[in-house]
């Protein structure tokens, strides 16, 4: 007389395990597809009837390193949970950053509260010349050559949001040419024209 079959054994159990492994692998691949930078972690206190209740806030920048970036702010009782919330919030606010040959199309200034950030295009090989908060946003966005300067507040939150405001204000040369009614050659950077000429050769 055959004994009772164990739950999960046999072909059905193996199929479930394989499916779980495939799903777990897909989730891990999606998680590692993004570049994450924790810009600031602060401990905050809320005064309640029984005393003070502490929690943590995390400012996180997430991007794919290829022109997409977002910023999120998370709050929780533990640091890892605050970071996780910040990552999810950042993914909800993804936006595209116009780039040309690893840099930005034109100089621009971004402002947020007392934070003011100036961004300028740079030639290949320059690298990211920027402070910590600005660098985090630019690296996650996939900008490899750029000059920047913070002209206002030193508050990391203001600096990050000022950088985001600057990147959101960037326009592609095609958009500028169409708005001004000019040919692309009159407004496009030389690097873009050389790249297009090389691609067409």
Curated annotation (Swiss-Prot):
Q: Record's family? A: Belongs to the universal ribosomal protein uS5 family.
Q: Its GO biological process terms?
A: translation
**The S5 DRBM domain, residue ranges:** 34-97
- SUPFAM superfamilies assigned to the protein according to its UniProt record, in alphabetical order: dsRNA-binding domain-like (SSF54768), Ribosomal protein S5 domain 2-like (SSF54211)
Q: What InterPro entries does its record include? A: Ribosomal_Su5_D2-typ_SF (IPR020568), Ribosomal_uS5 (IPR000851), Ribosomal_uS5_bac-type (IPR005712), Ribosomal_uS5_C (IPR005324), Ribosomal_uS5_N (IPR013810), Ribosomal_uS5_N_CS (IPR018192), Ribsml_uS5_D2-typ_fold_subgr (IPR014721)
Give the UniProt keywords, A-Z: Ribonucleoprotein, Ribosomal protein, RNA-binding, rRNA-binding
Output this protein's name: Small ribosomal subunit protein uS5
- Organism listed in the record: Streptomyces avermitilis (strain ATCC 31267 / DSM 46492 / JCM 5070 / NBRC 14893 / NCIMB 12804 / NRRL 8165 / MA-4680)
Domain comment text?
A: The N-terminal domain interacts with the head of the 30S subunit; the C-terminal domain interacts with the body and contacts protein S4. The interaction surface between S4 and S5 is involved in control of translational fidelity.
- Keyword RNA-binding in the entry? The reply is yes
